[in-house]
A protein has these predicted regions:
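N-terminal "domain-start" segment that seeds a small globular fold
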Residues: 2-32, 52
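Short loop/turn motifs at secondary-structure junctions and domain boundaries
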Residues: 11-13, 129-132
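Terminal helix/beta-alpha structural elements that buttress the NAD(P)+-binding lobe
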Residues: 16-18, 106, 120, 140
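Short, acidic, Ser/Thr-enriched surface-loop or helix-capping motifs
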Residues: 23, 141-143
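Short active-site neighborhood of thiol/selenol oxidoreductases, capturing the structured segment around
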Residues: 33-49, 70-75
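Structural microenvironment flanking redox-active thiols in thiol-disulfide oxidoreductases
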Residues: 50-115
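Structural micro-motif
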Residues: 100-102, 115-119, 130-139
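Conserved small/polar residues in nucleotide/adenosyl-binding loops
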Residues: 145-147
Length: 147
């Protein structure tokens, strides 16, 4: 599943770039620092049949990070309990098995009442198609500049 958005399409006064997220490293990321970039947000899991997509995500990160693409992985255990590990275990798994260097967030819910505000924003702004139905759902947020 893939959701594709242009932040300028929203009627919601809050944007993606007004939000924050905690990283798996323990640091906080203010998403306003990513203005002017294109964001690929992916809910991820270590024990999923789609986990091999980490290789592709890392390749995208390496190929396009200098051209304005930011890949963010958001671990979630909401689909089949396929991300049961601690954040330390998730980080080690990703680095050891896939040499992940793109941003990874803390583990969050990505659907329902306790979903991370990014996913609540996406659903309220763009509708139900943004709600992940399984692991490795992708949301692409374009940051277009209009003159």
């Amino acid at each position: 599943m893939f959701s594709f958005f242009n932040k300028t399409m929203s009627n919601n006064t809050e944007t993606f770039f007004d939000l924050n997220v905690n990283l798996i490293s323990g640091d906080a990321l203010n998403l306003s620092k990513l203005k002017g970039k294109t964001i690929l947000l992916v809910n991820v899991a270590s024990n999923c049949g789609f986990t091999k997509q980490y290789d592709d995500l890392q390749n995208l990160h390496e190929s396009y990070k200098n051209k304005g693409l930011v890949v963010i992985g958001m671990p979630s255990n909401q689909f089949g309990g396929q991300e049961p590990g601690s954040e330390k275990e998730i980080k080690k798994f990703c680095e050891t098995n896939f040499n992940i260097t793109f941003q990874m967030t803390s583990k969050y819910d990505v659907k329902g009442d306790n979903a991370h505000p990014i996913y609540i924003w996406a659903k309220e702004t763009f509708g139900k198609s943004t709600v992940p139905k399984w692991n490795f759902h992708k949301i692409l947020i374009l940051s277009l500049i209009h003159i």
